[in-house]
Each structure stands twice: as structure tokens, then as C-alpha cells.
A protein has these predicted regions:
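Short, solvent-exposed amphipathic alpha-helical segments in soluble enzyme
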Residues: 294, 373-377, 403
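Thr-Gly-centered strand-to-loop micro-motif
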Residues: 360-361, 388, 418, 437-438
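Helical hairpin unit composed of two closely spaced alpha helices linked by a short loop
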Residues: 363-384, 389, 394
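Catalytic-core elements of nucleic-acid end-processing and repair enzymes
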Residues: 426
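Histidine/acidic-residue-rich catalytic or RNA/ligand-binding cores of hydrolases
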Residues: 369, 398-400, 429-430
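N-terminal localization/anchoring segments of enzymes in phospholipid and broader phosphate metabolism
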Residues: 1-343, 348, 352, 392, ...
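NAD(P)-dependent dehydrogenases' Rossmann-like dinucleotide-binding region
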Residues: 354, 359-364
């Protein structure tokens, strides 16, 4: 809490100066108020037209239209600060500069080995084209149903690092987990291993601040914040929600697990913490290294840490390695374009599902297209299930998530809440042949407004592991039943209002 207060105290002077400037400006412009109000009203009208015709999620547009039409002047200002993607232009320019310097070669036209599954082949080719990351053969992948299981393996691999260690997480919080990792990073720095750390400034605002960064730099470990949070510049969106640990360009860890004790159940603020992750080796790791270095080179200060050479792209559909375990396409999702890649991938995979489609997610605030895809799949006989937390970490967000329940339940989707505690896992499994696991929640912010990383697996052993874990977790859940309409009539208005504001949360 003290760290949040200190951060707020650094923002207050800027807000005070801005407010004073606005008051003086208003006083000076008072004689011209009628003209100014008329001009601003016209500007608000054109802003409404712009929002209507722009390519964006319907719920997001509806929210801002209501705000601007209700409070034209204030609403227009809020939209310009927080609602449009122009505030992300500096991020986009930096990423584009790095991507141009990479000079990536176009992916070769080559059929994927999908055993005659033409529709799945089309999905993979689309995903490769949108993300510019190739599908690779999996040598070895290990699934972790809990962070408790993954952490010891992370430490063991850190001890064996020889060349490089790259750390990128949304939340870093000092404690047993982070301190143990830092100890290994310090040892490896002394051995000449290249160590780099990226953390999200807003995600870690209450746990990881300037003093923590200074401590790392004293140990010789380069560390940078992603998109420093400045309230007046509208940087609350476009966060780095990615989570990855990459060692020697040979081993990568990812999933929902951040670097904090609650993720390995050493702390229990919301009951038992259910999270998932995976460890992968071989050619697919190059995609993770490329993702990390793209961000590092885009957002680090050259004078401080230097630009790092980008690795070669992983081989696309190589000859199966000696230990072959299916295929994977790992990519990152960016809010700086209009693709919403993970959202579209879920819709596409749901359209192909024939037997079942199961989701883990901590939050449930869907756009209309994805919600319609779920309901459509359920109504044609696909077993669609969602596991949600039983104990929420954010009560208002949980209530907003529940505002979507009735529509989904009456559409044939089964929803379960994890009785022992909080579910933070973010994975999808379908028909025993495809799965995704990464950092993508089923909410608007994650699907449309954050940088995320996700891994799409095809005919790999991890698919059965995710399915088995889902079944085991469901046994600890309580099934949510459709609300009795007698009781629902008293809450549908509240649910409707909450769903309007869901895109902000």
C-alpha cells in the first residue's frame, strides 16, 4: 500500500498543475463560453460519427457513445485521453522500428501436416500470416496444473543457464519466489550470463517500484518498465500482460503464473490459487526469444543496455525431431492493430469444434462475436464449459463477469466456479486435438487492450494434460445453474448496466 501511495504522490502535483491551468483557462475564456460550447458540441458530434464508423468492438463503441452523448464535453475529453489508440502511437512507432530492422522473410508457402484437415490448415495459415510466427514441431513440452509444481523446475533450469536468461512478467512482487529467482540471476550474472528483466509498470505498481529496480541494477541486472504509467497520458491501457522466462534460447516457461508468492500458494489472499503453465524446449523457444527481444530493443534505452541481436526465426514445419510431440505456434497479441488475434482464434476454433470446447478463465466479459460463437457451438451439440473462480480477487470485476452468466447459461453453456479459491488459469482445449495456453483472459481488456502471449498446440500431449486437469478441477467446482426468472427479473437491470461498463474493466 505504501508503494501505491508514493506513486500517487508523484502524480498529484501534475494533476494539480493541470487543474490550475484549466481553471485559469476557463476564467479567461468565460466571455466566449457560448461560442466555445457550440464548437465543442460540433466536435463531439463528429467524434460520435468517428466512433461509429471506426473498426472496433461493438460493446466498446457503445460504452463511449453513451458517455459522450450523456456528457458531451467531459465524455469527449475522456475518450481522447483513454478511449482511443492514438495514445499508443509512441509504442507502435518503437515496435515498428524494431520489426523493420529485423527484415523478417515471408513465411514460405508450404502445406502443414494436418492429415487432410483442410479447415485446420486454413486456421494455421491465417494465424501465421497475422502474427508472423511459424508453427513448429514440439520436441518436449511439460504441463503444470499449479504454479507450485512449475517453480522448482524454473529454479533448476536457471541454475543450469549458460548463455542468457530473459524474464518478462506483468507482476513481480518481492517474496520467496522472486527472491529465489533474483539469487540465481545474480549468480549467473557473475558467471557472464546475459540477464534481462522486463516488468509492466502498472501491473507491478503495488509491488515493484524504483527501489526494487535500483537493487537489480546494483547487482548488474538490466531491468526496464514497460509503458510507464502516466495518468494524464492515458497509459492505463496497452499493458504488457505477457509472462515468459526464456533460458539459453533452449527452454521457455509461460502460462498464467506471475512472479509472486500467491501464484505458488505461499500466500492465500483468495483461498487456493489455481493457475497453470508449461515448459517447452527446442525450436519453438526461438519464438519466445524473438518476442522478448522485440520488446527489449523497442523499449530499452540504448545508452543504458544496448540493442541485442534478434535471433533467427524458428523453422517452419521442420522434419520431426527424435522426440516428436505434435506442433505449436507461439505468438504475441498486440492492441496496436485491429486484428484481436486471440479473440478471432477462439471464434475460429469454436466454429470447428464438434465434441467439446472447455475454457479456464479468471474473468468473463465477452464481446458479442465470441459470445455468439460459444452459444452457436453449444446449440449445435458441442459441450461448452467454462471454469471460473469461486473466490474472486476483485469483487466488482467478478460481479461484472457474473452479469454474463444468464445469457451463456440459457444458451447451453455450462459454467463452474472453483470452490477452494481463485482460478487464474487461461487455457482452452477442444476435441482432443487442439489447445491454447498463455496469458489471455476472456475479458475485453485482455482480448483487445493488452499485449498478450499465447501458444496454440495441435495434436500434442499437452492437450490431454489440459483436459485431464480440467476434469480434475471441475470435480472441485460448483456448477452454476440458470437463474430462476422470478429472481432474475430483479437483477437484469443491474446486469445490463454492468455489461455496458465491462469494456473498461
Amino acid at each position: 500500500m505504501g508503494k501505491i501511495i508514493r506513486r500517487i504522490l508523484t502524480i498529484i502535483p501534475a494533476v494539480a498543475l493541470q487543474s490550475l491551468w484549466l481553471l485559469l483557462l476557463m476564467k479567461w475564456l468565460t466571455p466566449y463560453a457560448p461560442i466555445i460550447v457550440s464548437l465543442l458540441s460540433v466536435a463531439a458530434f463528429f467524434l460520435v460519427v468517428f466512433i461509429i464508423i471506426k473498426r472496433d468492438e461493438t460493446a466498446y463503441k457503445l460504452l463511449w457513445l453513451l458517455v459522450i452523448l450523456s456528457l458531451p464535453l467531459v465524455g469527449a475529453l475522456l475518450y481522447l485521453l483513454f478511449g482511443n489508440k492514438r495514445t499508443a502511437r509512441p509504442l507502435k512507432r518503437r515496435l515498428q522500428q524494431v520489426q523493420k530492422s529485423c527484415n523478417p522473410q515471408p513465411l514460405p508457402i508450404k502445406e502443414a501436416p494436418f492429415d487432410g484437415e483442410k479447415r485446420m490448415g486454413q486456421t494455421v495459415r491465417w494465424l501465421e500470416e497475422k502474427t508472423q510466427y511459424p508453427m513448429c514441431a514440439v520436441e518436449q513440452v511439460r504441463y503444470y496444473p499449479l504454479g507450485d509444481n512449475m517453480f522448482p523446475d524454473m529454479l533448476a533450469d536457471l541454475k543450469n543457464a549458460r548463455n542468457s536468461i530473459y524474464v518478462e512478467y506483468f507482476i513481480i512482487e518481492p517474496g520467496h519466489m522472486w527472491d529465489a529467482i533474483v539469487n540465481e540471476l545474480e549468480v549467473k550474472m557473475e558467471q557472464g550470463v546475459d540477464v534481462r528483466v522486463i516488468y509492466d509498470d502498472l501491473g507491478s505498481i503495488s509491488s515493484f517500484n524504483f527501489s526494487n529496480v535500483r537493487e537489480l541494477k546494483k547487482k548488474g541486472i538490466p531491468c526496464i518498465p514497460f509503458n510507464p504509467f502516466l495518468a494524464l497520458k492515458g497509459t492505463a491501457n496497452y499493458r504488457d500482460h505477457r509472462k515468459m522466462l526464456i533460458i539459453d534460447n533452449e527452454v521457455a516457461y509461460s502460462g498464467g503464473i506471475n512472479l509472486s508468492d500467491r501464484y505458488i500458494n505461499l500466500e492465500h489472499p483468495y483461498g487456493h490459487w489455481k493457475d497453470t503453465g508449461f515448459r517447452i524446449t527446442g525450436e519453438p523457444v526461438k519464438s519466445f526469444t524473438h518476442m522478448f527481444l522485440t520488446f527489449w530493443n523497442a523499449f530499452s534505452l540504448e545508452k543504458e543496455a544496448g540493442q541485442l541481436a534478434m535471433p533467427t526465426y524458428p523453422k517452419r514445419y521442420p522434419a520431426p525431431p527424435h522426440t516428436f510431440d505434435g506442433y505449436v505456434l507461439s505468438y504475441y497479441d498486440s492492441p496496436l492493430n485491429h486484428e484481436a488475434t486471440s479473440n478471432q482464434l477462439f471464434i475460429d476454433l469454436l466454429s470447428q469444434s464438434t465434441d467439446y470446447a472447455w475454457f479456464f478463465t479468471p474473468y468473463l466479459m465477452l464481446g458479442d462475436d465470441l459470445m455468439d460463437a460459444m452459444i452457436s457451438a453449444a446449440q449445435r451439440g458441442v459441450d461448452v464449459r467454462i471454469i471460473m473462480p469461486g473466490i474472486p480477487d476483485k469483487k466488482l470485476i467478478f460481479r461484472m463477469s457474473r452479469s454474463f452468466y444468464q445469457v451463456l447459461l440459457t444458451g447451453g453453456i455450462k459454467i463452474y466456479e472453483y470452490t477452494p479459491g481463485f482460478v487464474h488459469a487461461k487455457s482452452f482445449v477442444s476435441d482432443d486435438k487442439v489447445a491454447t495456453i498463455g496469458t489471455v483472459n476472456l475479458d475485453y481488456r485482455s482480448l483487445f487492450l493488452h499485449f498478450e502471449n499465447n501458444s496454440f498446440f495441435y495434436r500434442s500431449s499437452i492437450i490431454a494434460a489440459i483436459k485431464d486437469d480440467f476434469i480434475a478441477t471441475q470435480a472441485k467446482c460448483k456448477e452454476v445453474k440458470p437463474y430462476d426468472m422470478k429472481h432474475y427479473s430483479r437483477r437484469w437491470v443491474v446486469d445490463g448496466v454492468l455489461r455496458i461498463f465491462a469494456p473498461l474493466c
